[in-house]
Design a protein with these regions (language model features):
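A conserved FAD-binding loop/helix module that cradles the flavin
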Residues: 294-335
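Beta1-alpha1 glycine-rich phosphate/pyrophosphate-binding loop at the start
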Residues: 4-67, 71, 145, 154-200, ...
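A Rossmann-like FAD-binding core segment of flavoenzymes
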Residues: 72-99, 175-262, 352-385
Length: 418
């Protein structure tokens, strides 16, 4: 049986960075990817805006992935492409993975695992769209794959449900390719995507955005013929009498992303109900010792640069992993936060500057965020504005916090003085 220090599952941006981090820390590393090429979703992202933080340049997704692939080739990590992980079992102080690839079935042993499995898109059935099941109802990522990788046009007259970033980007992309985009319809009262994408993808191209609207029904036999849209109330329930029918041949869905964590759940990794990803500590180790997580499998990120940051940190931590007892301090947040990651601090690991990511639950003006350790204020930071679609990053020095097992770290939001 082949033995590795670290096995990484998923060869997208997080997995590439994790493999690089593990190899730089001296670990014998295997990166497992189910597709024929590394890069994950970046392979179909031909728009720019990637790499401003990591490389100080504005790159396309393909260029960003290529840079990491080239770095990976030079560091000596092994890769297994077109390979699925069908099973992971705990074995002694490590793990045994069953891999299915072109050469058949094989097993490998790992001292530590990094799960970088990314996320998947919600479908029409997950957001309760009723009606028939014609062709032409597809997720924004699928539409992007058709256009950017296959050179096929999936729509001529379409509408987009949901204002997530990929939906906004595809509204622009479809328009550039000659499709008529009737509008972007969002059930929430505010958009779900980044402000810059609202501006660059919709406003610059004259594409209307309808908030507090949703699709209630799709109609068509073999191909989509029309959709029914309606206004929604504060609880996002359709308002009777506001329905209208729109003729179109395609409905593009951008209604949210869900971290892929079937393997994590099979290993008994506890998940956070808010992020839908695993609970983890400051080294990205989950509550199952030796299992690390990073990227969109942990929580859905806005920027690939942050995905790579978590990947490199998780890979390096996995390379250093030695089975030992943990002393966990819990991280909690008041009602103003949607979530905070990481959710635990292992007090047996060296304390120092720790990066936290969070999203607010609702849009806020000038806001002060304070961090308390057992009731004592450690630090505070003032934000001019907070929006749920825009993830925030906060670095806190925990070296003088005096944390111990059972300590409690609390994030608090309060209105800042004007």
């Amino acid at each position: 049986m082949e033995r590795y220090d670290v096995v990484i599952v998923g060869g997208g941006p997080a997995g590439l960075a994790a493999a690089l981090g593990a190899r730089r820390a001296g670990a014998k590393t295997l990166l497992v990817e189910r597709e024929a090429r590394l890069g994950g979703i970046l392979k179909q992202c031909i728009h720019d805006g990637f790499g401003l933080l990591r490389f100080g340049e504005r790159l396309s997704g393909c260029e960003y992935a290529h840079r990491y692939i080239e770095m990976l080739r030079g560091c000596g990590a092994q890769t297994a492409l077109l390979t699925f992980v069908s099973r992971i079992e705990k074995s002694g102080e490590g793990f045994v993975l069953t891999l299915v690839g072109r050469e058949g079935l094989r097993k490998v042993e790992a001292r530590a695992l990094v799960l970088s499995t990314g996320c998947r898109e919600r479908t029409a059935r997950q957001v309760s769209i009723h009606g028939t099941r014609p062709a032409g109802v597809l997720t924004a990522g699928t539409a992007q794959h058709y256009i950017n990788r296959m050179g096929e046009m999936p729509a001529r007259r379409c509408m987009i449900l949901g204002s997530g970033d990929i939906g906004l980007i595809m509204a622009r992309r479809l328009t550039l390719e000659g499709a008529q985009v009737l509008g972007v319809y969002e059930a929430k009262p505010t958009p779900s995507g980044l402000s810059r994408n609202i501006s660059q993808c919709l406003e610059d191209f004259g594409i209307p955005l309808y908030t507090s609207h949703t699709v209630t029904r799709v109609s068509g036999k073999e191909r989509l013929e029309r959709v029914t849209v309606a206004e929604v109330d504060a609880r996002m329930r359709p308002i009777p009498g506001t329905e209208q029918e729109l003729e179109c041949d395609s409905l593009i869905l951008s209604v949210g992303l869900i971290p892929e964590n079937e393997l994590a759940e099979a290993l008994g990794v506890p998940l956070d109900a808010r992020t839908k990803g695993p609970l983890c500590d400051q080294s990205y180790m989950t509550l199952v010792p030796g299992v690390f997580v990073c990227g969109n499998a942990l929580h859905v990120n806005d920027l690939v640069d942050y995905v790579s940051e978590s990947g490199e940190a998780a890979g390096a931590a996995a390379a250093r992993y030695v089975p030992a007892a943990c002393g966990l301090a819990e991280v909690s947040a008041d009602g103003g936060f949607g979530y905070v990651v990481p959710q635990r601090i292992d007090t047996t690991k060296p304390a120092g500057k720790t990066t936290f990511f969070f999203r607010p639950l609702a849009e806020r003006g000038k806001t002060r965020v304070r961090m308390l350790a057992d009731g004592r204020e450690l630090c505070k930071k003032t934000y001019m504005q907070l929006k749920p679609p825009e993830m925030e990053r906060m670095v806190v020095d925990l070296s003088g916090a005096g944390l111990h097992a059972g300590s409690r770290l609390t994030f608090v939001m309060e209105e800042a003085d004007t």
